[in-house]
Amino acid sequence: MAVAECPVPMTHGADIRADSTWFSRTQRTPDVLIEFERFDGTDRGQKKLDEKLCNLLEASMRWGDAPSVLILSAWNKGVVSAPNKEVFVQRCRQGFKSSVGAQVPPLRNTAVLFSRFIFEIECSGTLLLKQMRCERLL
């Protein structure tokens, strides 16, 4: 069962809502958390993706590390440079301190996937999905 913009438990003050949360019907806990973000190939775009990853990591912690899979999904129109995935891997392996001072630990038993959707703008102005890529970061 999936929920969009699902709030995570409030344990450290900041409101976090995963873009998509997939729940186990039997356990009634989240199995998969997903964040989506447009990526424009800039440093600012890289920072936005990192912020989305931090949301995933903190949301997982707040759910008691229940999710078995976290997915960071980036999409773009046209050709842009690829994001630096090593930054994401290090964030997952090292953890971080949240904006409210909560320590988010490194991931232990959670898979992290990075997916990309590359769209092309057609002459009619519509978008056409040209490529999809998905790889496991952890």
Language-model features: locations:
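Domain-level recognition of nuclease-like catalytic cores that cleave nucleotide substrates
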Residues: 72-138
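Hydrophobic beta-strand residues in large extracellular and virion-surface proteins
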Residues: 20, 34, 70, 112-114
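Alpha-helix termini
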Residues: 24-27, 60-66, 96-105
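Conserved catalytic cores of phosphodiester-cleaving nucleases, focusing on short active-site segments
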Residues: 20-22, 30-40, 56
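Active-site metal-binding core of divalent-cation-utilizing nuclease and nuclease-like domains
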Residues: 1-28
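Catalytic cores of nucleic-acid endonucleases
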Residues: 39-95
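Conserved acidic residues
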Residues: 31, 68, 124
